[in-house]
From Swiss-Prot:
Membrane found in the keyword field: yes
Lineage: Eukaryota, Metazoa, Chordata, Craniata, Vertebrata
Enzyme class label: hydrolase
Region (Interaction with NR1D1) location: 590-693
Region spans: Interaction with NR3C1: 9-236, 258-578
Protein name in the entry: Heat shock protein HSP 90-alpha
Sequence positions bearing Phosphoserine: S231, S249, S429, S452, S603
Any single Pfam family the record assigns to this protein: HSP90
UniProt source species: Oryctolagus cuniculus
Modified positions (N6-acetyllysine) in chain numbering: K58, K84, K419, K434, K465, K547
Keyword Nucleotide-binding: yes
Phosphothreonine modified-residue sites: T5, T7
Amino acid composition bias (Acidic residues), ranges on this chain: 242-255
Reaction(s) catalysed (UniProt annotation): ATP + H2O = ADP + phosphate + H(+)
Length: 694
């Protein structure tokens, strides 16, 4: 075994040992750690390696301005040395080390600001793994150790040893053992039931899980017994007596056992995100992705970038090939991005790092600005994190847009994560426009290919102001809908929205590129072709109706009257008119809340549209519109204000239908009388156009 594993067993007669009491809060914390059962004990190694990494960061920083600081040891590394015989695990670093004052203050007599906060968090049910966020990670050593010895050497002081069995006190003495040069050695004397942390496999597993991206080499020292072959020449010494062979014995090579120390670097996967993206191959990204996620498939897309300026961070984001089966489960952690601060892993479930709709993104974010001991509460308030989040979302959307340029790959992406895009449209108002460009739908004209809203807009008819859609359960179901059939007759394309989340999506997505999204199954459907006719009819009817709209409900009738949500029904209007003490002002207001719905598929309405478009000043249109309106009133259960005028219009239509000329002197007196009472028909010189209505 290397010299570092030798614990200090030298005589201590001449060494002065000082004993100190732990500060009250630290003693409480240690008692809590020792006497409470925690299943997640393995985090002790992460914390000690993280501390070593911090110490190495400090000496490296000092050496930038004063290279002589590294004269006491140029190599910056961390060694892990398990010793099964002594039941010790030693963590050695060549970091900045501690002076005697540092030892006394940092490891026992001065409580960190986070000590009390962490104890409160623990008692409230927080996980022990959060210990490092409160700056007291060192004490996690007592999760597995009954005694801890810390030997340290700082450039400005002698070599000292700190030791405690957590009995409320610790000792500090000058260390006369093997000179370290510079750095710190933490020797854990493990509890009898914690020897699993001496196993090579277990140590490798923990380092891979928690510390594989530490910026300094972590080397594991393992003693291996090897069978060493001994040649015949070596085996026989010059003085050996001649060997007498046993009769019948096989010729066998002599073997002897030899104990060797294997050194294996555990974190060869260097922080790939710190390298220049141009120097990294797809294979390297693939290996890193698999080591990060344990996914058996390669990633679908990757985005590697860094942000510099007032804020500095690097990020590496991956899109997996398939969505996890529990993507939208409530109990699932909110994201899969690991947060590092200066190469030290902080957490992998920081909800503030990325919005929920992007929770399928895997990767790492490494910030230079966040403090290492940041807590969840601090993260929630952190302005730095808000800026990081905004940048991550922006880069994710860029990545999806780039992916959309490759139809095949985007199809795979959309099959897996379309729900996330739609959830984003519902939740993320700031990026709604960009997200809407990523949507893909089947339409009544696209066949088996999904198209974007932009594609739909390029195929829109001239003067079409709306994007028409229908929601339903399956493509076949909505394709066979009567609503879709009507629009297809008019040459209009309808988008098929067949996922439940589409309903929530379109609640927020009101328009795309200035075109309003309109459901073909809801009231208020406007066909551009009939917009002009509806406007003309409203102008003619003035206050008689609140609005004129294209109907979704009519099949055989040319038009009908419906009341608005707040207007009176036909029956209610009849009842109110019969009231002796009625309020006439209310009558006029409530009675006016009628909607005239026209059937775009009816020949009367189509011919009327053509008539109005052929000559906007055709006065016969006015009579036809009023006649249609009054007839619709009757068929919808309402009464007429002036039945006689309506009757006169009907008689006039009958005359036209029979081909009777108004100027014919042989016309009967009754007809003449009717004609006198009736207002002159506007535009009656063109009887042929009136006949087109039939």
């Amino acid at each position: 075994m290397p010299e570092e594993t030798q614990t200090q067993d030298q005589p201590m007669e001449e060494e002065e040992v000082e004993t100190f009491a732990f500060q009250a809060e630290i003693a409480q914390l240690m008692s809590l750690i020792i006497n409470t059962f925690y299943s997640n004990k393995e985090i002790f190694l992460r914390e000690l390696i993280s501390n070593s990494s911090d110490a190495l960061d400090k000496i490296r920083y000092e050496s930038l301005t004063d290279p002589s600081k590294l004269d006491s040891g140029k190599e910056l590394h961390i060694n892990l040395i398990p010793n099964k015989q002594d039941r010790t695990l030693t963590i050695v670093d060549t970091g900045i080390g501690m002076t005697k004052a540092d030892l006394i203050n940092n490891l026992g007599t001065i409580a960190k600001s986070g000590t009390k906060a962490f104890m409160e968090a623990l008692q409230a049910g927080a996980d022990i793994s959060m210990i490092g966020q409160f700056g007291v990670g060192f004490y996690s050593a007592y999760l597995v150790a009954e005694k801890v010895t810390v030997i340290t050497k700082h450039n400005d002081d002698e070599q000292y040893a700190w030791e405690s069995s957590a009995g409320g006190s610790f000792t500090v003495r000058t260390d006369a053992g093997e000179p370290m040069g510079r750095g710190t050695k933490v020797v854990l004397h493990l509890k009898e039931d914690q020897t699993e942390y001496l196993e090579e496999r277990r140590i490798k597993e923990i380092v891979k899980k928690h510390s594989q991206f530490i910026g300094y080499p972590i080397t594991l020292f393992v003693e291996k017994e090897r069978d060493k072959e001994v040649s015949d020449d070596e085996a026989k010494q010059p003085d050996d007596k001649p060997e007498i062979e046993d009769v019948g014995s096989d010729e066998e090579e002599e073997e002897k056992k030899d104990g060797d120390i294997d050194q294996e670097e555990l974190n060869k996967t260097k922080p790939i995100w710190t390298r220049n993206p141009d120097d990294i191959t797809n294979e390297e990204y693939g290996e890193f992705y698999k080591s990060l996620t344990n996914d058996w498939e390669d990633h679908l897309a990757v985005k590697h970038f860094s942000v510099e300026g007032q804020l500095e961070f690097r990020a590496l984001l991956f899109v997996p090939r398939r969505a996890p089966f529990d993507l939208f489960e409530n109990r699932k952690k909110k994201n899969n991005i690991k947060l590092y601060v200066r190469r030290v892993f902080i957490m992998d479930n920081c909800e503030e790092l990325i919005p929920e709709y992007l929770n399928f993104i895997r990767g790492v974010v490494d910030s230079e600005d966040l403090p290492l001991n940041i807590s969840r509460e601090m993260l929630q308030q952190s302005k730095i994190l808000k800026v990081i989040r905004k940048n991550l979302v922006k880069k994710c959307l860029e990545l999806f847009t780039e992916l959309a340029e490759d139809k095949e790959n985007y199809k795979k992406f959309y099959e897996q994560f379309s729900k996330n895009i739609k959830l984003g449209i519902h939740e993320d108002s700031q990026n709604r426009k960009k997200l809407s460009e990523l949507l893909r739908y089947y339409t009544s004209a696209s066949g088996d290919e999904m198209v974007s809203l932009k594609d739909y807009c390029t195929r829109m008819k001239e003067n079409q102001k709306h994007i028409y859609y229908i929601t339903g359960e399956t493509k076949d179901q909505v394709a066979n809908s009567a609503f879709v059939e009507r629009l297809r007759k008019h040459g209009l394309e309808v988008i098929y929205m067949i996922e439940p989340i589409d309903e929530y999506c379109v609640q927020q997505l009101k328009e795309f590129e200035g075109k309003t999204l309109v459901s073909v199954t809801k009231e208020g459907l406007e066909l551009t072709k009939f917009e002009n006719l509806c406007k003309i009819m409203k102008d003619i009817l003035e206050k008689k109706v609140e609005k004129v709209v294209v109907s979704n409900r009519l099949v055989t009738s040319p038009c009908c009257i419906v009341t608005s949500t707040y207007g009176w029904t036909a029956n209610m209007e009849r009842i109110m008119k019969a009231q002796a003490l009625r309020d006439n002002s209310t009558m006029g207001y409530m009675a006016a809340k009628k909607h005239l719905e026209v059937n775009p598929d009816h020949s009367i309405i189509e011919t009327l549209r053509q008539k109005a478009e052929a000559d906007k000043n055709d006065k016969s249109v006015k009579d036809l519109v009023i006649l249609l309106y009054e007839t619709a009133l009757l068929s919808s259960g309402f009464s007429l204000e002036d039945p006689q005028t309506h009757a006169n219009r009907i008689y006039r239509m009958i005359k036209l239908g029979l081909g009777i000329d108004e100027d014919d002197p042989t016309a009967d007196d009754t007809a003449a009388a009717v004609t006198e009472e009736m207002p002159p028909l506007e535009g009656d010189d063109d009887t042929s156009r009136m006949e087109e209505v039939d």
